[in-house]
């Protein structure tokens, strides 16, 4: 029988000092036999996805206390990728994931907490907490802040839906008037919550649901809706049950590694491919799998991508649907239900509610459930009122979207595409693979060949795009922006958005060893591995070289002979200490970022730290 971890600090005469300190936090004699549960919050006023979380930790803590546990809250950092984007701040985004994971480990292990409730929402916070949870392997439940309502405004006598990406594209389009750009900017992000499309934050919150570590509805129920409060209340109660099951009944099924096992990771990736999620999810799932000691690699993702169809299309791949529409169509479990009927899921998995996948679908799939409360929950909709307050409205759709032939979520028979929304490409300058969000690629450019325009920083590429130096047919290559080379693996949302604003969204390709925002669409290929700074062949590409992209056949090729590539590699090595570094880039890199870069691996490994360098 496992012993409560917290007993280390609450039992025994030699822990009198620790108990004295616990008493100073409000604990009493009756608390010293109860489980101590960490409420890991991520409130910050910097991030709209987290601005409403201040009081939600207390909400969870009160339920923990009422259910027989002791709740102790702490906070992690949270970077807003959208605000950090387009300048040096983006260098810090991905490294913050490791800091979040480490800070959770530090707090939980330093104070011997028995379990956790993780209150996350945005891009690197959910992955960082997920990595920590699987590293620590103590009972955990995730409950996120929820998606933002889609922006809406009237343009050309038509009401259109908007998000952050629209504001960026219109702001850079010289053909758009200042008045229209300002109108879109003011309408794009109307409420608290994670940005309203299937961007990285919402993708990851959907995936925690598919992994079984969060409750049904977590990935899609709006941040502003009153129904979301119940997820927080339930999390506080349920975590005490899970904790007691493990420590008092020796039930290891309550542990995250036994819930989020390899079968669950395969289901989560299957969901991601089917819903056309962010390419960043590949990076984060690979990293989380390593923390869980699960053998889940790019090869597994490649295999899944070849058999899973695209059953859902959401912004940025279309402006017709946002997360509020996904929720109305049944949310994550609506998509999983269709995948299950197609025979594409592992059914022998459980979630934090203790339900198997078939049991969960029976209760929560809107196409089969008889539970009117579930149907009511999935009718939770937007209010269209600007607010930063959680649970501030209770509007509902008049009906559910259960049209699997022409609705937001499709059945296998009526899939948007027989090929899924993500694909892994391999070739002679991406030997370990690269990722493309096929859900956002127009059919006309699934095969694309063109001359390379090479840039050694995102800034240089943006200047060239806006300066008219990139033309129709070009393949823009941005290198030395990987985990080590950036350092920090910047997102390339500005280059892709500016290609659209210049009318080149369907006329050019963009390839990088960096990564893309979940808001990216178009022929945007990222995560090229090995990266340039690690000796990757992408460092050897020169202006004018022909690059051939063939998404249907999962191929990407630099059309040079092996002899020419070898000669260029030899010339690169001859640069000595300057080998595999940018030639003319001026970038100030802090000590903290250099420390990150010294241990960073390429994207095919999840950009995690190289344990072998530490003897691990």
Swiss-Prot record:
Substrates-to-products reaction catalysed: (2R)-2,3-dihydroxy-3-methylbutanoate = 3-methyl-2-oxobutanoate + H2O; (2R,3R)-2,3-dihydroxy-3-methylpentanoate = (S)-3-methyl-2-oxopentanoate + H2O
Disulfide bonds: none
Gene Ontology MF: a single term: magnesium ion binding
Positions where N6-carboxylysine occurs in the chain: 124
Cofactor binding mode and count: Binds 1 [2Fe-2S] cluster per subunit. This cluster acts as a Lewis acid cofactor.
Catalytic EC class: lyase
InterPro entries from the UniProt entry: Dihydro-acid_dehy_C (IPR042096), DihydroxyA_deHydtase (IPR004404), DiOHA_6PGluconate_deHydtase_CS (IPR020558), ILV_EDD_C (IPR056740), ILV_EDD_N (IPR000581), IlvD/EDD_N (IPR037237)
Keyword field: 2Fe-2S, Amino-acid biosynthesis, Branched-chain amino acid biosynthesis, Iron, Iron-sulfur, Lyase, Magnesium, Metal-binding
Positions that bind [2Fe-2S] cluster: 122, 195
Residues given in the record as Mg(2+) binding sites: 81, 123-124, 491
Entries under SUPFAM superfamilies matching the protein: IlvD/EDD N-terminal domain-like, LeuD/IlvD-like
Highest taxon, organism lineage: Bacteria
UniProt record, GO biological process: isoleucine biosynthetic process; L-valine biosynthetic process
Requisite cofactors: [2Fe-2S] cluster; Mg(2+)
GO cellular component, one term: cytosol
Pathway(s) served: Amino-acid biosynthesis; L-isoleucine biosynthesis; L-isoleucine from 2-oxobutanoate: step 3/4; Amino-acid biosynthesis; L-valine biosynthesis; L-valine from pyruvate: step 3/4
Catalytic residues in the record: 517 (proton acceptor)
EC number: 4.2.1.9
Function: Functions in the biosynthesis of branched-chain amino acids. Catalyzes the dehydration of (2R,3R)-2,3-dihydroxy-3-methylpentanoate (2,3-dihydroxy-3-methylvalerate) into 2-oxo-3-methylpentanoate (2-oxo-3-methylvalerate) and of (2R)-2,3-dihydroxy-3-methylbutanoate (2,3-dihydroxyisovalerate) into 2-oxo-3-methylbutanoate (2-oxoisovalerate), the penultimate precursor to L-isoleucine and L-valine, respectively.
Oligomeric form and interacting partners: Homodimer.
Membership in a protein family: Belongs to the IlvD/Edd family.
NCBIfam families: ilvD, PRK12448.1
HAMAP family for the chain: IlvD
Full protein name: Dihydroxy-acid dehydratase
Organism annotation: Salmonella paratyphi C (strain RKS4594)
